[in-house]
């Protein structure tokens, strides 16, 4: 039995966020989501920026529980569902806010979009020769499945249980990482490592330690992105990573691949972002293109 297909614009309301303009924007400073904060299936809320919003813009640019937040550019279609992680959040112009009608289950629409994006099914709605975008009108033309509402709800609820389990595990991982950071600070910053009482400290380090430049103990290379025509989602070639867009909590996520490459990083390499947010770190799980 085949499901009915409808255009996204027929079953949702969508809009872009606010343009960042320091000279024209008025109101009070409030946090907002930018493209970099939206990952595949989750939000990176560690480096939120703020801009001015007027009180009457809360409805226009505000987001609420169940809104689907979709990237307009960068990696068009990358999306996550908002669940009031932070109150009174707004969005910047690089993002679409999609709010479903009552005839659709927001979880089903989200998981459909997540799958379509991962499979490259959204590329037909992109515009641009080198830098890809998915403007509002194209977004509204995206054809999505529309099974009976009860079926949507069952699918959405079933898949959501896995996401909830993942989220709980990630919270536990974060607590463990915070504990590891505290231990690192205690040992290597405060120098309160086991046996420190009997260790002589010279110039801020134990007497037997040495200070080295990074390039004396590691190979440091700068990435060089291949042309976008070589990118794919079909796992052809090697995973390709550019900036923090594919960063995970600790390890990079292999979403985009490239059949052409000049610079590569081997497994267990440390990636250091050189563009905003500068200094973000991640680790490679395997050989990748950078």
Where are these regions (language model features)?
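Short, positively charged
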Residues: 107-138
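A generic structural signal for residues embedded in beta-strands
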Residues: 70-71, 272-273
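Non-catalytic DNA-recognition/assembly elements of restriction-modification systems
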Residues: 1-19, 141-225, 246
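Sequence-specific dsDNA recognition surfaces
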Residues: 6-24, 36-68, 85, 199, ...
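A short glycine-rich beta-alpha junction/loop motif
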Residues: 1-2, 89-96, 127-156, 287-290
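Short, Lys/Arg- and Gly-enriched loop/turn segments at beta-strand edges
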Residues: 76-83, 279-284
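Ligand-binding loop in jelly-roll beta-barrel domains
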Residues: 85, 99-105, 285-289
């Amino acid at each position: 039995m085949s499901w009915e297909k409808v255009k996204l614009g027929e079953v949702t309301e969508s809009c872009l966020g606010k343009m960042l303009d320091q000279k024209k924007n008025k109101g009070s400073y409030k946090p907002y989501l930018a493209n970099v904060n939206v990952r595949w299936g989750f939000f990176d809320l560690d480096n939120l920026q703020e801009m001015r919003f007027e009180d009457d813009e809360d409805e226009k640019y505000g987001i609420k529980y169940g809104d689907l937040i979709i990237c307009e550019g960068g990696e068009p279609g990358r999306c996550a569902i908002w669940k009031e992680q932070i109150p009174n959040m707004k969005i910047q112009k690089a993002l679409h806010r999609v709010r479903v009608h009552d005839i659709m289950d927001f979880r089903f629409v989200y998981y459909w979009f997540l799958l379509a994006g991962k499979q490259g099914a959204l590329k037909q709605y992109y515009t641009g020769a080198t830098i890809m975008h998915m403007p509002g009108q194209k977004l509204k033309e995206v054809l999505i499945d529309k099974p009976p509402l009860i079926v949507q709800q069952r699918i959405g609820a079933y898949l959501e249980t896995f996401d909830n389990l993942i989220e709980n595990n990630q919270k536990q991982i974060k607590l463990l990482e915070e504990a590891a950071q505290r231990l690192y600070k205690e040992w290597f910053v405060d120098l309160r490592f086991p046996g420190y009482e009997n260790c002589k400290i010279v110039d801020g380090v134990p007497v037997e330690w040495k200070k080295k430049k990074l390039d004396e103990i590691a190979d440091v290379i700068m990435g060089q992105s291949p042309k976008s025509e070589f990118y794919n989602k079909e796992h052809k070639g090697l995973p390709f990573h550019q900036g923090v867009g594919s960063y995970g909590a600790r390890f990079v996520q292999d979403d985009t691949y490239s059949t052409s490459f000049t610079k590569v990083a081997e497994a267990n390499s440390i990636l250091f972002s050189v563009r905003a947010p500068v200094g973000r770190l991640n680790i490679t799980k395997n050989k990748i293109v950078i």
